[in-house]
A protein has these predicted regions:
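RNA substrate-binding interface of SAM-dependent RNA methyltransferases
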Residues: 18, 46, 84-177
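Short basic, glycine-rich beta-strand/loop surfaces that mediate nucleic-acid
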Residues: 59-72, 139-142, 151, 185-193
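Short, acidic/turn-prone active-site loops that include or flank metal/cofactor-
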Residues: 31, 53-55, 126-128, 195-197, ...
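N-terminal positively charged helical leader segments and presequences
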Residues: 1-84
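Short, glycine/polar-rich helix-capping loops at beta-to-alpha or helix-loop-helix junctions
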Residues: 33, 128-134, 197-203
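Structured adenosyl-cofactor binding patch, chiefly the S-adenosyl-L-methionine
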Residues: 14, 19-20, 137-140, 201-240
C-alpha cells in the first residue's frame, strides 16, 4: 500500500478531490456544513467517516476546518521527465529553490507558481523543506496542479538545464541587473534562495546572470515567497 498523508482545509481538499491523487477516505466533524465537498466525495465514491466534535479535535486538532482527507502521498516528478514534458514549448519557466526551509513560504510560492502558469518547481533533497501537510494547506490546493521535482545536486541540475537550452537566472541582492531588464523569453530557470542566506556561492557562480529586486527601504531583503511572486509575474508580463 502506498504511503498516505492527511490533507487539511476545505480549499486544499476541494482541489485534491478534483485532482488525480487517490483519496482513501474523508473524515468529517459532525458539525461540518459543506455539502459541496461531501457531494463531490460521494460522486467519486470516496468513503466518508463522521466523528463527533470532541473525538475529531482530539485526533486532528482544531485548525482543520472540520474536515480531513487521507490522500496518497505527493509524487515528485523526475527532472528528466519535467524537462521532457516541456521540451516542445517555446517559453518555459522553472523555479529553483535553494535552501528554502519554511513550509509556509513554500506553500505560498506554490500558489504563485500555479497562478502564473510557471512550468515547474525544483527543490534540493537536502537542506530544504519537503512537501508536507503544512505546505499543502498553505498552498490551498495549488500543489495539486504544480509539478515539483526533488534533486540531489542543484549545481548538477543547473548544468543539465543549461545543456537542455535553459538560461539560468539567480535572484540576489548583488545581482548585476534589475529584474525588469532581464530577458524572460524562451526557456529559463530562476533560482530563489532563502531570505536568511540567499543563494549559495557555488550556485551563484553556476547561474548565467544574477538579477536583483531594488530595495528602497531600511530592510535589505524580501520574504522568499514575495520575491518569487514578483519575478514570476514579471516573466509573464514580458511574454505578453
Amino acid at each position: 500500500m502506498s504511503k498516505t498523508v492527511n490533507v487539511f482545509g476545505k480549499n486544499a481538499i476541494r482541489e485534491v478531490l478534483k485532482g488525480s491523487r487517490r483519496v482513501e477516505k474523508i473524515i468529517i466533524c459532525d458539525t461540518l456544513n459543506d455539502n459541496e465537498i461531501i457531494n463531490l466525495a460521494k460522486t467519486k465514491r470516496i468513503p466518508i467517516q463522521t466523528k463527533n466534535k470532541k473525538a475529531f479535535i482530539l485526533e486532528f486538532g482544531d485548525k482543520t476546518g472540520g474536515i480531513v482527507a487521507v490522500v496518497e502521498d505527493y509524487q515528485y516528478i523526475e527532472l528528466h521527465e519535467l524537462v521532457a514534458k516541456n521540451e516542445d514549448k517555446e517559453d518555459v519557466v522553472f523555479l529553483i529553490l535553494d535552501g528554502l526551509e519554511d513550509p509556509h513560504n513554500l506553500g505560498a510560492i506554490l500558489r504563485s507558481v500555479d497562478a502564473t502558469g510557471c512550468n515547474g518547481v525544483i527543490i534540493p533533497k537536502n537542506r530544504s523543506v519537503k512537501l508536507n501537510e503544512t505546505v499543502v494547506k498553505v498552498s490551498t490546493g495549488a500543489i495539486e496542479h504544480v509539478d515539483v521535482s526533488m534533486v540531489t545536486n542543484l549545481n548538477q541540475t543547473i548544468s543539465e538545464l543549461k545543456e537542455a537550452g535553459y538560461w539560468v537566472y539567480g535572484l540576489e541582492l548583488t545581482g548585476s541587473i534589475d529584474y525588469k531588464q532581464a530577458n524572460y523569453k524562451g526557456k529559463i530557470a530562476i533560482v530563489v534562495g532563502s531570505e536568511g542566506k540567499g543563494i549559495s556561492q557555488l550556485v551563484q557562480k553556476n547561474c548565467d546572470t544574477l538579477i536583483k529586486i531594488p530595495m528602497y527601504g531600511k530592510v535589505n531583503s524580501l520574504n522568499a515567497s514575495v520575491s518569487a511572486g514578483i519575478i514570476l509575474y514579471e516573466a509573464i508580463r514580458h511574454r505578453g
